[in-house]
Amino acid sequence: MNNFPYHRICVVGVTGSGKSTLASDLARRLQLPFVELDALYWGPDWTACSDEELRQRADEVIRGDAWVVDGNYSSIRDLTWPRAEAVVWLDYPLPLILWRLWKRTWKRVLTKENLWGTNTEILWPQFFSKDSLFLWALKTYWKRKRTYTDLLSRPEYASLRVYHFKSPRETEAWLRQGIL
């Protein structure tokens, strides 16, 4: 039985926090469309679309009355958040984020998992390049904490129901409450 009152939900957090996993699970449980912003952003061979193109793609999907959006693209936050009813913020400790990123990267490299079409992760760049997801997580972790704390306290987002989880245990307890 679905007693969850919100039908437009944004799941946010740093890379490796579990946004896609949780958003996909929420969408399945609530029987809502799942929108993975990375899938809108990345083209073949890791070609990024322009901000304008991302905005057009995102605008098309969030026009609907119900969705679960996964992602942190600040260039479209002005589209997604005003339409959202709830934000789920996965604000987990940095060591856990890095551990999850490590496991996810190895799994994707070893299985050659396709991401957003034909893209696959390659070991060396993920660990040792300036485009490393690990480096990105380290660079953005504290900035994201400050950004979300600030954004979620702004009057224009006062109508959002915020679920702020600081550990996977908190998130799992919320999911077990039976509202979903």
Where do the language-model regions lie?
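A glycine- and Lys/Arg-enriched "phosphate-lid" helix/loop adjacent to the NTP-binding pocket
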Residues: 92-144
